[in-house]
Amino acid sequence: MKKKSLNAKKKIHKKLLNYLKNPLISKIFRDFENFLLNCNDAKSFAVAVSGGPDSLALTYLSKCFSILNDVNVKYYHVDHKLRNESTEEAKKIELLLKSFDINCKTIVWKGQKPKSNIQSVSRNKRYSLIIKQITKENISHILVAHQLDDLYENFLIRLFRGSGLKGLSSFSRSNSGSSKGVIILRPLIKYNKKDLLYITNKIFNYYINDPSNSNENFKRTRVRKLINNLKQEGLDENKLKLTISNLSDSNSAIEHFVRENINLNSSYSKSNLTYIIRANFFAQPHEVIFRSLSNILKKVGKKYYSSRGKSLNQMIKRIKSKKFNKATISGCIIEKISNSLIIYKENRKKC
């Protein structure tokens, strides 16, 4: 690198780090830094940059982290093409971040776009596109900018859907989000949106304002409004946080027995990508069986999300019947051999 370019980079880095003298920014960054440093197996990170205030605050904090800890951090923005201005916004984000010595790669969503359930489908597509890209680059951890308001909204949306314990408590600070082994990290989940907005305005003085965030045709917008109304009835944020924390503790206990069930009552062959399930696997409480089988199907079928609960419950019922022989679910084949089951990917020859 030329001396002139190196000096310019140092000036930019010094300017970015100077903002850490701000008490609020410093407090959030120290917690952010400690969280990432405790991800012992992470050698590099990817950051999902939507261009909104939350993600730009995340971008700034992760850039400071990379400077101070000499850690490789890469940044990705998805041009979803759902709005006419999305490509222009992507260019603005690239140029803005470049002026702060942050190289942001834009991934274009090509192909057919959803006509219904737009927000959910789009969110899942953004995840899958970025995860596909970072897997090629051997990056195993992705940072996303979910914050405290997102936690509450997600909890209520899943409650309205009738989600079980896992669904209601799965929006944690760290969780496996992909069959490809990518870990999703939410380092800002403890913080309010107003704090992140403060950081973004202080550093960048710019962010993309997504009009869908105020469109009441979308459930998330209506839920956001509902939360404000519920405060008047006594369900404030502290009570929501306590409820989610209690559910999360209960969920962790069940996950312990799920891991134990998989370890003791199944075996995995890496050479032919096959699970062998022993009879005692299905002698556990239903929730443990359900989650254990779901995890195995995700791994074998290389699926981002688990099977629908109804489909999986029906499959468990079939497997337990004496007449069960063979079935297909989530891109996997489940076949009974003597008192055991083998599970392997569909359209693949058994070894």
Give each language-model segment a name.
Residues 236:
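Catalytic-core segments of class I nucleotidyltransferases/pyrophosphorylases
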Residues 1-54, 72-76, 80, 109-114, ...:
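AMP-forming adenylation/ATP pyrophosphatase catalytic core
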Residues 2-226:
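Core alpha/beta nucleotide-donor-binding catalytic domains of modification enzymes
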